[in-house]
Regions:
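Terminal domain-initiation and capping elements
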Residues: 1-95
Length: 95
């Protein structure tokens, strides 16, 4: 039977899923540990000093580290800001 008042959408089906992304910093031979850690501290919200240093060490040891994950728009902003400070960045990875 047709509902003349309109169709009610199922909220579970109608919610748009916003794309998420990962921000990854790559190791390089020219940025110092201090510079990388400072960039992470000043650009990534809620980044603690300990976490910034842990990520910096991981970048050095493994070649890269995911420094932030979340909605694509924010990921693009953090990626651009870190890149503008001279960090070597992997392309944004959509998840």
């Amino acid at each position: 039977m047709f509902n003349t008042l309109g169709t009610v959408l199922d909220p579970k089906k109608s919610k748009a899923k916003y794309p998420e992304a990962r921000v990854i910093v790559l190791d390089d031979s020219f940025n110092t540990f201090q510079h990388v850690a400072n960039c992470l501290l000043t650009i990534i919200p809620s980044m603690s000093e300990k976490r910034a240093w842990d990520l910096t060490i991981k970048i050095d040891k493994t070649g890269s580290a995911e420094v932030w994950r979340g909605n694509l728009e924010q990921a693009e902003l953090y990626h651009e800001q870190l890149f503008s400070k001279g960090l070597t960045m992997a392309p944004i990875e959509k998840t």
